[in-house]
From Swiss-Prot:
InterPro entries listed in its UniProt record: LCN-type_CS_alpha_beta_dom (IPR044062), Scorpion_toxin-like (IPR003614), Scorpion_toxin-like_sf (IPR036574), Scorpion_toxinL (IPR018218), Scorpion_toxinL/defensin (IPR002061)
SUPFAM superfamilies per record: Scorpion toxin-like (SSF57095)
GO cellular component: extracellular region
Keywords: Disulfide bond, Ion channel impairing toxin, Neurotoxin, Secreted, Signal, Toxin, Voltage-gated sodium channel impairing toxin
Subcellular location: Secreted
GO MF entries: sodium channel inhibitor activity; toxin activity
All copies of domain LCN-type CS-alpha/beta, residue ranges: 21-85
Tissue-level expression: Expressed by the venom gland.
Electron transport is among the record's keywords: no
Cysteine pairs bridged by disulfides in the record: 31-84, 35-59, 44-64, 48-66
Record keyword Disulfide bond present: yes
Name of the protein in question: Putative sodium channel toxin Ts30
Amino acid sequence: MFKLAIILALLFFGARAGAVRDGYPILSDGCKYTCKPLGENQNCSRICKEKAGSWYGYCYMWACYCTDVSKKAVLFGDSGTPECHVWIK
């Protein structure tokens, strides 16, 4: 039973370490890239590719959201990023 618990813990922590990172890329002021229309969006796909090293992006809640971003990408909410103080851009 103890061995099973160790194996499950290793699998869990291993999966977290290699977890795919998704999120909102940000402008230099810490704000998200706004978009419309919602859903498939060529502008968001371009932003995600250029700013986050992502292969796919779409417009979600009026902001560009990127999937499977590079480890170097800076995303909204990352520590050390500026806080956005603008409600509408």
